[in-house]
């Protein structure tokens, strides 16, 4: 695992790890750039602490640190901390204070993330051998070169980790994820969206045996995003549900192998879910909606977009039992009619956001039920609803004064109707395809 471009000194030091001529550590507010002439390789530039003091306007960072008044929410990001460490010896010591390293954020498709994590965690472990007690968040989304080795570094060195985002890192596998959730008992937020090799979330065999007093064989994750984990099946979802019983937010978008049976397992164990997305799960039907309805008033957010097997029957289950629903995305559910919208409007009166685009059987009648019952509606999408006319829109605008977003693209709506909406809902942004209205 040697790297000819690695320049290592005997003194532990800050590292800037990035591909040449491209951003390294990213946070949306700037990035470091390489001064190395080496090309075609990911460069890890390692520096010893500067021997002299330099005068710099950023000295206020030192005074804040000395007074221990630094605001945690305003801590410098990864790239800036590494740059600060190169100013002088005093700043070097300040920049590597573990209290400043609550978060590590790395981005870039070509960055050697495994090496970066190894160097960073090694330096942050100087005061507390082998562990980074202050590190709570690691975000390495989109880093395609991240492998199981990098995740194992996190699992070994970050026992206090609470948030991990590795979306789009398609080289990581189940084993690495098992290590993280087993060795980081405080982990609450996990994003593995786009990690196509991840098919399950569970404890390692060793953790199940040795750490049962600590875990109770449970994982403390509350937020789990498995969007685009195409290989996830009902059996894997069963295992996830059995181990992650504290889940409140679960996103299974485009997990195309999930069926109603998987949702049945989920509702047996995870009874505290507030937000759930099964959009584009084509095997989910009205029977799955019956299972989801068991969440009752706890459910606030539900996305069933493009689940073509769901009809008014499934909507009726949700409307009857999930009365506190605030958000529903049913775009592309072509089996939903005005009857389904009626059930929804009369029972979920606190609905704030509704997407029934591409539901050709929904007409002005359904809109009238919405207008007369859901006065708090703020966002409404009717895109490509062929049966909607200007009359239905006018009824909505006359009753839902707080409407802030209306999508009527590809709908047969007149200019007069759009002007009526704009006149009554002054803060409403209208998305349309009528060139005569502006």
Residue spans of the language-model regions?
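A structural signal for leucine-rich repeat
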Residues: 118-123, 151-157, 177-184, 200-217, ...
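Conserved hydrophobic beta-strand positions in leucine-rich repeat
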Residues: 104-106, 133-141, 162-167, 190-193, ...
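CRL adaptor-proximal regions
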Residues: 1-68, 437-438
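Short helix-loop-helix/strand-helix junction enriched in hydrophobic and basic residues
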Residues: 81-98
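The Skp1-binding helix-loop-helix core of N-terminal F-box domains in SCF E3 ubiquitin ligase adaptors
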Residues: 69-81, 98-99
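F-box-proximal linker/hinge
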Residues: 47, 55, 59, 106-157
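C-terminal interaction modules of eukaryotic adaptor/scaffold proteins
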Residues: 373-438
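Short, solvent-exposed loop/turn at the beta-strand->alpha-helix junction
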Residues: 110-117, 144-149, 170-175, 196-204, ...
